[in-house]
Amino acid sequence: MIDPVNNFKIPEDWIARTGLPREELETKVASGMLVVLSDGSILKRGYTTGTTASAAAKAAVLSLKKTVDNVSVPTPVGLRARLEVSEASQGRAVVKKIQNDHESDITRGLDFVGEAREAEGIRVLGGKGIGIVRRDGLQVPKGQPAINPKPMEQIKAAVQEAVEELSLRGAEVTISIPDGERIGKETLNSRIGVEGGISVLGSTGFVEPWNDHLGETRGDLIRCTDKVVLTTGRIGMRYSHMLFPDYTIVMIGSRISEGLDYASGDVVICGLPGLVLKWGNPDMLKDGEYATVVEMLEKDPEHPRLKEAFEMAIEKGKGARIVVIDRDGSVLMDSKNES
């Protein structure tokens, strides 16, 4: 049985410990909404802001010509997500971001509003409650709504489905989050240069229910291998499979030190600079000259703090190989090449 969101093969003893009929468990796991832990307990994933926005956008378009109470939208990992629609009429729809077991997901329960009109082609706009990018170095250009590229693709794909279903020429959809500006103040957005609301994010379409129990699950996986790559996210995971094909790849997010505690043998830490270098030196951005590590890399690639943070990461790695990659998979830094 394989978790379709992270491609993790769930061990048979974990499956047995759930106590659920195999067919029932397989159906639920296949939906992407459940995570099975090593002790047999089950946690619920949620849908990202990107998936919720996609549902609101699609429902808004469909409501131009029909009644809508739920919608199915594509996700970046290839699964379908079905969400309830709170309101939908005359080109306006509301979808609530569902609950999940991620204890610190402050966007749970937020209303996402889509407002649509027929137009030429597909166009998605950011409305009230979606932050605006005010600094360079992020995935979204300065001055644009903070809708990351992957969820933007997802939203446009969902709108395209609705356009085809209704045989429209195209559609323009504005996404807004009425409570987004207030919630945005509780996030790190202002520190990285996003103002006025939250960001629309999500590389998989699903919110992982990260907590201490999942730390144990990953700990079990790390312990079981003597050749492991600890990676910080899905981009790192994708390219780690290519760079280290005979290693076990484990996604640990920002918990690099915790992952190292479980690891032995041949260990690699591989990921984007924002997490790996800041793990090496958490204070590398303290003077406020740059908002993000990416901005520092782009504007001053020879900045001494980059090398300093990398050297500190090597020291903290206690013999692990440290590999820092770019978003296209190119290797920026590799401790194997250090003299």
From Swiss-Prot:
One of its GO terms (molecular function) is cobalt-precorrin-5B C1-methyltransferase activity. Its EC number is 2.1.1.195. Pathway: Cofactor biosynthesis; adenosylcobalamin biosynthesis; cob(II)yrinate a,c-diamide from sirohydrochlorin (anaerobic route): step 6/10. It catalyses: Co-precorrin-5B + S-adenosyl-L-methionine = Co-precorrin-6A + S-adenosyl-L-homocysteine. GO terms for biological process: anaerobic cobalamin biosynthetic process; methylation. Pfam families: CbiD. Keywords: Cobalamin biosynthesis, Methyltransferase, S-adenosyl-L-methionine, Transferase. InterPro entries: CbiD (IPR002748), CbiD_sf (IPR036074). Belongs to the CbiD family. PANTHER family: COBALT-PRECORRIN-5B C(1)-METHYLTRANSFERASE. This is Cobalt-precorrin-5B C(1)-methyltransferase. It comes from Methanosarcina barkeri (strain Fusaro / DSM 804).
